[in-house]
């Protein structure tokens, strides 16, 4: 139906109407306002302390971190970890968070994870939403701003959680984001860092072990010599190769049973080891 806007010359009220095409789908309002994509200055320190010194040491039996010297202390960084469990987002800050670099991590998460009470918590802990099918311009701009500020961003390149321990097909978004930002602002020096996370159990339970291996950075500037689309595919292929190498090394370590171990014996108190050159304080239980 088509109606027109008209005003009566005798002072009567206006009649305002518009044409509405029933076949046109209007875009929904953003589910999460951009202004809410901020880390809480009070919640983050509390949650980080609880996770690092209480929750993780109490839950896991053995936490091993290798390669912390590969984490830059400054400059834009994109961590590209394997995705094996919901514990990953707690384990990553433990392995490469503020105790190591003095900065917090930003997480790219799905829109569904930003709803309700969980969403309130996620958004204040560095998470921000992305529509994996149709990324909003605001989200892409936010990523570029994070890179300009020299932040540390976490993107799970596999997308979903895979509990079989194998590296699955990587999404191309992480390479495209890195190269687009580096192309738009030459000299940013974006580094993409492969990270392997492996648990001793597919569904980690109390007393399970976790092995985090951090590889050397992939320099985004090394992929700026040709067509960005082709270079993004090359970066994705190189990232896949590195993640597979890390995962295989972690699998070998996981299959080595310690001497005098017994499946029936209860888990020992959390033993934390780091094989990088950076030594971290270990809380006493």
What is each stretch, according to the model?
Residues 2-31, 137-285:
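Non-catalytic C-terminal accessory region of glycerolipid acyltransferases
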Residues 65, 107, 127-129, 192, ...:
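Conserved beta-strand scaffold positions in the cores of enzyme catalytic domains, especially
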Residues 69, 111, 131-133, 196, ...:
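Residues at the C-termini of beta-strands that transition into short coil/loop
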Residues 65, 115, 137-140:
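Structural motif corresponding to alpha-helix initiation and N-cap regions
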Residues 61, 133-137:
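A conditional alpha-helix N-cap/helix-loop micro-motif detector
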